[in-house]
A protein has these predicted regions:
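N-terminal Rossmann-like dinucleotide-binding module
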Residues: 1-43
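Active-site loop of classical SDR/Rossmann-like NAD(P)-dependent oxidoreductases
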Residues: 14, 35, 263-277, 291
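A contiguous active-site-proximal alpha/beta segment in oxidoreductase catalytic domains
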Residues: 93-151
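Mid-domain beta-loop-alpha active-site segment that forms a flexible
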Residues: 116-123, 149-181, 295-296
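Contiguous beta-strand/loop segments that form the cofactor/metal-binding neighborhood of enzyme cores
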Residues: 165-242, 266, 272-286
Length: 309
């Protein structure tokens, strides 16, 4: 198997490193000479290109794309038409129309299309997915996701596009469906038309609600997911890497029941390595990735709906 990487900058260099360590890196493309030189130093045996199109025209089986989002559509489409399996970093595209076109293209050419929703591959998130599937919380009521800290502010994309993409992917994955209604409210404090602080509310057909708060203008670093169900509650502290099961509920007589709490999962593996190993496995087995093109389309669709507010 041969995997080429297009984009070897800030994040792309991590893809280069991991594919190299996995023994499948064949080439790297980047328009910036400093990034190309860094790739040469890291992977002397890899072919180095200044153009992603040249890498696509080569003999690699698959391509990983870590370039600015506006370039995703053209590069992914070119790769699929060339018969390559594709891994593309989040968000998949700028619009749901572009994302849907890529999904159809991948299906037409029978290619793997995977989107880099990294948090889905955190071991705690995989544990929570199994935990919910076993029905231990009973009927789900609502989910609360927080991702906020001081910085890193951006000039163009708002905090939801920067930080919230991860959380939207997780919420959709855990609920297992697309929201029927989306509401959002944000505040532009540092600059006009770029929200620093955003609240998102989603309603699903089965009555589940999800609430998301993203901010890069916040005094403390907080990354926490809370899930409320009829039989209890889960809290995932991403910083501490713990999942705590609170056996707390309110019964039919509106009495508060507290049967204690326990840490049911602790620790985390390297999600990027797990994610890329999953991509390689999907190429070999031809199974659909956890974060396939339709998953990427669902996330972009929610992002579009948020931007309407």
């Amino acid at each position: 198997m041969k995997v080429g990487v297009i984009g070897a900058g800030n994040w792309g260099k991590n893809l280069v490193k991991n594919f190299l360590e996995l023994g499948v890196l064949s080439g790297v493309a980047d328009p910036v000479e400093a990034n190309r030189q860094a790739a040469r130093d890291m992977a002397p045996s890899a072919e180095i290109f200044s153009s992603g199109r040249d890498l696509i025209a080569g003999d690699c089986n698959a391509i990983a794309i870590a370039t600015p989002v506006p370039t995703h559509f053209e590069l992914v489409a070119a790769g699929l038409r060339a018969g390559k399996d594709i891994f593309v970093e989040k968000p998949m595209t700028l619009t749901s129309g572009e994302a849907e076109e890529l999904v159809n293209l991948a299906e037409t050419h029978e290619r793997i299309l995977m989107v880099g929703h990294l948090l889905l591959f955190q071991p705690p998130i995989q544990f929570i997915k199994r935990f919910l599937g076993e029905g231990k919380l009973g009927k789900l009521y609502h989910l609360h996701q927080e991702r906020k800290k001081l910085g890193r502010a951006r000039y163009i994309e708002n905090v939801t596009w920067s930080l919230g993409v991860h959380d939207i992917a997780v919420l959709l994955y855990l609920v297992g469906s697309q929201p029927r209604r989306v509401f959002a409210s944000g505040h532009c404090g540092l600059q006009e038309k770029v929200e620093d602080d955003v609240y998102v509310h989603m309603e699903f057909l089965d009555g589940i609600k999800a609430h998301l708060h993203n901010s890069w203008l916040w005094p403390t670093n907080r990354r926490q997911l809370t899930i409320i169900g009829e039989k209890g509650m889960l809290v995932y502290d991403e910083i501490a890497a713990t999942v705590t099961w609170h056996r707390k509920r309110i019964n039919d007589e509106l009495e508060s029941i507290d049967e204690g709490s326990e840490v049911v999962f602790e620790g985390s593996g390297p999600p990027l390595r797990i994610e890329l190993e999953h991509f390689i496995d999907c190429i070999k087995t031809r199974k659909a990735p956890i974060s396939d093109g339709r998953n990427g389309l669902a996330v972009v669709t929610v992002l579009e709906r948020i931007m309407m507010f």
